[in-house]
A protein has these predicted regions:
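Short Ser/Thr-rich beta->loop micro-motif in glycosyltransferases that lines
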Residues: 2-3, 76-80
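Short hydrophobic beta-strand element within catalytic cores of glycosyltransferases
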Residues: 97-100
Length: 193
């Protein structure tokens, strides 16, 4: 998701891991989403591995949501340049099991591996190992996806907005009981007097 031809996106790390992965998971398919020129990556790849990689191009928000809900795992092999990792939050929210490099932003978001599997950044062998383990263990993959999806709800804007609103409301109104329904809010009762 994003310009895959930018080195910091780490697509080369994933491509370098593919020969190892395909030895253990011969049916593996890699879908690459985002704008960029796929020929740049395909030219140096073993022809037998090329048919395992499909470049989808840039996805609309709707297509991105469908994508996240349909994959066995979302791989983020980024090598740096991320301050939060919104794409990981989107993948988690979509119910995908996440495998990501251990760059600080991803490690923090995934809480050191609690909500997604981490691999050593720029280490294609470690990436291959983590992907193979995760895809071979459907129970772990499903559990990781479920826990990640639950965790991602805290990043939903309606929930974040509601929590911010409650903080302001408590600061303004004081000790009044805070509810989730607008009609029960202390400020609303005062406003409607």
């Amino acid at each position: 998701m994003g310009r895959f031809n930018e080195p910091r996106k780490g697509l080369k790390v994933l491509i370098d891991a593919l020969p190892i992965i395909s030895r253990f998971l011969p049916e593996i398919k890699v879908l690459v989403a985002g704008p960029g020129d796929p020929d740049e990556f395909l030219k140096d790849i073993d022809p037998q591995l090329r048919n395992r990689i499909k470049f989808l191009g840039k996805l609309t928000e709707s297509e991105k949501a469908d994508f996240m809900t349909s994959v066995n795992a979302f791989i983020a092999p980024n090598t740096g340049g991320e301050s939060f990792g919104i794409i990981l939050a989107e993948a988690l929210a979509g119910g995908a099991a996440v495998v990501a490099s251990d760059i600080p932003a991803f490690e923090a978001l995934l809480q050191k591996g609690k909500y997604g599997r981490l691999f050593k950044s720029e280490d294609s062998t470690d990436l291959a190992k983590v992907i193979i383990e995760l895809l071979r263990d459907s129970q772990e993959r499903d559990s990781l996806a479920k826990n990640g999806q639950s965790f991602a709800q805290r990043f939903d804007w309606s929930r974040v907005g509601e929590e911010i609103f409650e903080v302001y409301e408590m600061a303004i109104v004081g000790k009044g009981k805070v509810g989730l329904v607008s009609d029960n809010r202390p400020w609303n009762r005062i406003w409607n007097r």
